[in-house]
Amino acid sequence: MTNHDFIVTTQWSVGRDEVGLAKGDVINESISIPSSLGGVGEGTNPDEMLVAAASSCYIISLAATLERAHFNDISINQESVGTASLTNGKFKMEQIKHQPKISVEASQKEALEKRLDKLLKIADNNCMISNSIRGNVDIKIEPYIL
């Protein structure tokens, strides 16, 4: 087994109406409670970062899966929506829905349509974030081929 450490430091002062900082090798972002939840809404927030992590992991995994399946001249634009709920005073991410729009050469469109379901599952199974949240967060994939 090989382990990889991803180190992020966070800073916060005072109460809930403040702005903190999340910093890693590349990320250097202000963090706060979203304004939609009564916070100051500056920078990003853990909910958005969770959806961004799931989305970026899935799109990278999907691109690699399509490449290994010999679909080389593609582009993917994806929207991902995280749906959270408040139940008994506790917030929980219920679902993350990925909607990849895959552009492929016309000559490969039919072949991709035939193999797409299997390739989507392979990509999801190879995504570390999907593997980490599966069982706690429902992951939906609604693809479009352009």
Q: Residue ranges of each PLM-predicted region?
A:
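Extended beta-strand/beta-hairpin segments
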Residues: 1-52, 60-146
